């Protein structure tokens, strides 16, 4: 998967198109990601230890990883991701600038 937890991404399709956020959770086997503040849903929750009253809670649902683009840290623009082998390690590279994304 081309994105990791903690990466800043831009949504490129769907109801939240154009919004930016940070990846909270990446699910490579399903090909999905959860982005902070994106694709929020209202969930009915029974009373429990964390939420003694229960009620309706806003939470983020996952979206397909193909619907997000990584934001290049060097110029803060959305970019496609390529890969290069540097010192025997596979690193992610911005297609726009050619710079390494992984530090």
Curated annotation (Swiss-Prot):
Keywords for this protein: Ribonucleoprotein, Ribosomal protein, RNA-binding, rRNA-binding
Keyword RNA-binding applies: yes
Coiled-coil segments: none
GO molecular function terms noted in the UniProt entry: rRNA binding; structural constituent of ribosome
One BP term from GO: translation
InterPro entries, sorted: KOW, Rib_uL2_dom2, Ribosomal_uL24, Ribosomal_uL24_CS, Ribosomal_uL24_KOW, Translation_prot_SH3-like_sf
GO cellular component: ribonucleoprotein complex; ribosome
Quaternary structure and partners: Part of the 50S ribosomal subunit.
Family: Belongs to the universal ribosomal protein uL24 family.
Function, as annotated: One of two assembly initiator proteins, it binds directly to the 5'-end of the 23S rRNA, where it nucleates assembly of the 50S subunit.
NCBIfam families: rplX_bact
Protein name as annotated: Large ribosomal subunit protein uL24
């Amino acid at each position: 998967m081309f994105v990791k937890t903690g990466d800043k991404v831009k949504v490129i399709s769907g109801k939240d198109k154009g919004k930016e956020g940070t990846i909270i959770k990446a699910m490579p086997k399903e090909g999905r990601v959860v982005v902070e503040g994106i694709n929020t849903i209202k969930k009915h929750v029974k009373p429990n230890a964390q939420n003694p009253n229960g009620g309706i809670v806003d939470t983020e649902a996952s979206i397909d990883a193909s619907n997000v683009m990584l934001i290049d840290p060097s110029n803060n623009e959305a970019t496609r991701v390529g890969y290069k082998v540097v010192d025997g390690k596979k690193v992610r590279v911005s297609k726009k600038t050619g710079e390494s994304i992984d530090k």
